[in-house]
Amino acid sequence: MLFRTLLGLKKMAVTGLLQQGGRDITAKMVYAAESERPAAQIRAMSKIVVSFTDDGRRGVAGAISRAISIVMRGISLRASVIAGLSEKLGFFAPVEFEDFVWRRFFAKTLPVDDRPHVLAAQYRVLPLAMATLHRLKISLSGLLRVKRFKKIETRDFDVFISQTPFPGVLSSNTKLIVRYHDAIPIFLPHTIKDRAFHHGAHYDALARNVRSGAYFACVSAATRNDLLKIFPEIEDRAVVIHNTVSPIYSEIDSPKELVKDIVSSRLFRPLAKKYKALSSSHADVFTRSRLNADQQDFEYLLMVSTVEPRKNHTSLVAAWELLRSRHNEALKLVLVGDLGWDYAEFVDAIVPWVERGELFLLSNVAAPDLRDLYKHAKVTICPSYAEGFDYSGVEAMMSGGVVAASDIPVHREVYEDACIYFNPYSVESIVGGIREAISLRNASETFAEYRRCAKRISARYTAEAISPRWDEFIQSVGSAP
């Protein structure tokens, strides 16, 4: 969404950067458009596409070859950092690879009307994965007295925007803007994945960016406040620019009957055999039969989030169980999102409900289908202990739903009055918040008033509302001494 928003700015030329998170792109880079050698250039770019998805090595021999390559490449990269050599950005033209660019990077979040715009853009490729850049610094920390990061050749660009603290050194003429989403790896390190690595990687890159004079575009005032607790000296370099929410989420007419079809077709199928109850053919058949046979109105609560400790799924399930036992035994719970980390205890707790066809864990739900789920849910619930922004509440507002959320600073900031708040540490408080939201939904006049408020607040997070802030900020950074 950010890239599409930036493409709409008229006063600057925007180039996209293609980079992997965890695995390097090992194909040979193309460094300039070569009109005289089209076949060779297309072949080279085709190999880059392959490298994004597959390194081509199979079986035991492939594993050995891969391991040797990783060791040799690691030695070479460490030497290049010590020598101060820069990594060049490759050139990538999407004109012959439109399907790859669209479906891999944009199709899940952008409407198809945006396809021509993102495919007309220019792209560069950074072959080193973000994880590689972090590990290079970490692996050299014991060898060098001063922490060093890999240099990246960016002299063709005035401004470089990174979606995380950037573990690299840009060319001297290029100014860095860090899109800062949250300080959770620092303030809630017990909730993150691969804690030691991600905590150290986040802090070290962030500290390097601060020292180098980087600017920070924080996704919320709450995130900016956390950042300034750590580095108060960057107050003048840190601004708030909220996230842009996809225009796919809008209030349209859709029959509630679609919900059962969406639920039955998107049932989660985990790889772990331990949780086969979530995906066995027996469970699938039972769930679909239960959905088809149930003549009652399909009433459900909705939560959209990866399953991980910070998101507070366990408390929500406990609250839902109380609601069922006290007030409405027919109330279902729909959870949309993949299994992240530290989820075993939670999954063990929900398996009986899944087997009974009362709780539904969904994955790979397309944005238009998610829009329908938001619209018809009794309440969309955002129970996290901490967030940087939290898209799901705004998406629900835009889609015509009602939102109940944990009473944390970022929710108060982003959702304002278009939300019912509860204490995320109290199951009884969650129950009370959900009941209040359901009552609001069921009262036509109150619901209409709520919807007017939700439309007004969610309109702040459209591209039309956010793009002027980016324009102003980038222009100011570009003109800064």
Q: Language-model features: where?
A:
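Carbohydrate transferase catalytic cores enriched for Leloir-type hexosyltransferases
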Residues: 1-481
